[in-house]
């Protein structure tokens, strides 16, 4: 099977940013298998790779992306763990993620879970700063409720492009999907 390019992969658009519809979630992958599977997924046409600090596999994901030779065609998403959302911790952790991934930029940086102990305005301020400084192309959230989506979109100085949530026929998320649509975000 020949590889497809990112521009030919089916995508959704949020606020001018195109996100491949199908992505490889790496939450259960570890070690050499993670690197090999990531590389092979890209070679057969996957153009979105999803990882997170909590998965403890950013190094292997980055290895697989680089080994594919197709970095410019692949969107890499990573997520900041909730215990690292305070401004100093967040900035340091994003730089550590980039170092582990060994990439020049993160394509999409998400807050993995909200942390009620850290003011959202502070977290989003640092995420916007990381975008302005070129550490990430876009920012978004994961596992946010409708009320948190409303608050985040009200206070963020940068557009939030998505709320990554579990969504399938056995888990109705219509209210969150509706809130995302209202704010021009994708799920």
Language-model segment annotations:
Residues 75-92, 101, 110-113:
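Structural motif corresponding to the early beta-alpha repeats
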Residues 27-29, 52-54, 79-83, 111-114, ...:
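Active-site beta-loop-alpha junctions enriched in small/polar residues
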Residues 24, 41, 49, 61, ...:
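Conserved, mostly hydrophobic/aromatic
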Residues 1-74:
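N-terminal binding-site loop/beta-alpha segment at the start of enzyme catalytic domains
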Residues 29-42, 85-102, 122, 147-151, ...:
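Short, acidic/polar
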Residues 13-16, 40-43, 62-73, 95-104, ...:
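Acidic (Asp/Glu)-rich catalytic clusters
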Residues 114-187:
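Beta/alpha (TIM)-barrel catalytic core signal, keyed to glycine-rich beta->alpha loops juxtaposed to Asp/Glu
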